From Swiss-Prot:
Region (G4), start-end ranges: 136-139
Root EC class: hydrolase
Region G1, residue ranges: 19-26
Location (main, coarse): cytoplasm
Organism: Hamiltonella defensa subsp. Acyrthosiphon pisum (strain 5AT)
Taxonomy of the source species: Bacteria, Pseudomonadati, Pseudomonadota, Gammaproteobacteria, Enterobacterales
Superkingdom of origin organism: Bacteria
Residue positions binding GTP: 19-26, 81-85, 136-139
Keyword tags: Cytoplasm, Elongation factor, GTP-binding, Hydrolase, Magnesium, Metal-binding, Nucleotide-binding, Protein biosynthesis
Known partners and oligomeric status: Monomer.
The enzyme's E.C. designation: 3.6.5.3
Name under which the protein is recorded: Elongation factor Tu
Length: 394
């Protein structure tokens, strides 16, 4: 059997379900695939197919995640669902499954619960740009006023974490009833799909973003100059483009005088490609792995930032013991380790393996960074944690 070709006619959007345990995230995921496959084509996935999430490794961390896809008339969606709370935390922090938007599932019978709050906070910290709400189990609540109260509570909670609570689409429904074939509740799933189409804007493609290439290797070619190699993370570069070398040392501006891939000369290098970039007037020793090549003015070097971090358990190959304030591990950004010190939130004395925590990090060298950049925490080359830059301080 030949593999069917993935037709990319429609824009592709990454979404996922978040919310408190047992509020119906997986049931909703199954309901969406079931209802939309009937209406628009695609593959229906049963609850147990989604619930038995396969293990994946992201940055050395084991995460259970289910991936499903579905279509609306205008878009193709890739949707992630995680079985356990810890999987959500790891998924969001490592960026294993980047989300352009999230569907927050809240059971109308319970209202917002501790993990509801925690997932909204995580979404804010790791830069999930849009949240929609599916108010689930509405068939079990007879009182319309009660539904209204729960809705208000959810809106207030979203606003607390800087999401536009008042303007957030909230769809009232029942995932289970929709799965069982109840037409009125299936219509609510279609309504949710329409809301996804309308509320989550089409994300900017990597190729349209400003050029950035993390430098992996540097060598000099006699008579031609210095070449840096790496994979273009975003944007594109053309011969004679002006570029900045950012991070670790003072920022330097230079010009790209040639681009090559597999020993062939190219006119341009694009997002996703491994290329060598020839730089004008730069000596081999002026540049090192861990710096980035970037479009001038598009990214700055920083040493201090607030981070959201997950610390690996012993079983995941992490530390066996807690760490305390003044802990000095290495922070691995893109292609290199930089030593840094940490400050813990007030009232937190120690961090245990398996915890997720907010911390303030100060690096000994500046690194090119923006909010949302992922990193690993390492001790002597062994990964002990994963993190994301929540907010650059300086």
């Amino acid at each position: 059997m030949s593999k069917e070709k993935f037709e990319r006619k429609k824009p592709h959007i990454n979404v996922g379900t978040i919310g408190h345990v047992d509020h119906g995230k997986t049931t909703l995921t199954a309901a969406i695939t079931t209802v939309l496959s009937k209406k628009y084509g695609g593959q229906a996935r049963a609850f147990d197919q989604i619930d038995n999430a396969p293990e994946e490794k992201a940055r050395g961390i084991t995460i259970n995640t289910s991936h499903v896809e579905y279509e609306t008339p205008t878009r193709h969606y890739a949707h992630v669902d995680c079985p356990g709370h810890a999987d959500y935390v790891k998924n969001m922090i490592t960026g294993a499954a980047q989300m352009d938007g999230a569907i927050l599932v809240v059971a109308a019978t319970d209202g917002p619960m501790p993990q509801t709050r925690e997932h909204i906070l995580l979404a804010r910290q790791v830069g999930v740009p849009y949240i929609l709400v599916f108010l689930n189990k509405c068939d079990m609540v007879d009182d319309a006023e009660l539904l209204e109260l729960v809705e208000m509570e959810v809106r207030e909670l979203l606003s607390q974490y800087d999401f536009p609570g008042d303007d957030t689409p909230i769809i009232q429904g029942s995932a289970l009833k929709a799965l069982e074939g109840d037409e009125a509740y299936q219509e609510k799933i279609v309504e949710l799909a329409n809301a996804l189409d309308k509320y989550i804007p089409e994300p900017q493609r990597d190729i349209d973003k400003p050029f950035l290439l993390p430098i992996e290797d540097v060598f000099s070619i006699s008579g031609r100059g210095t070449v840096v190699t790496g994979r273009v993370e975003r944007g594109m570069i053309k011969t004679s483009d002006s570029v900045e070398i950012v991070g670790i040392k003072d920022t330097v501006t230079t010009t790209c005088t040639g681009i090559e891939m597999f020993r062939k000369l190219l006119d341009e290098g694009r997002a996703g490609e491994n290329v060598g970039v020839l730089l004008r007037g730069i000596k081999r020793e002026e540049i090192e792995r861990g710096q980035v090549l970037a479009k001038p003015g598009s990214i700055n070097p920083h040493t201090k930032f607030e981070a959201e971090v997950y610390i690996l358990t012993k079983e995941e190959g992490g530390r066996h013991t807690p760490f305390f304030k003044g802990y000095r591990p290495q922070f691995y950004f893109r292609t290199t380790d930089v030593t840094g010190t940490i400050e813990l939130p007030e009232g937190v004395e120690m961090v245990m393996p398996g915890d997720n925590i907010k911390m303030l990090v100060t690096l000994i060298h500046p690194i090119a960074m923006d909010d949302g950049l992922r990193f690993a925490i390492r001790e002597g080359g062994r990964t002990v944690g994963a993190g994301v830059v929540a907010k650059v301080i300086k």
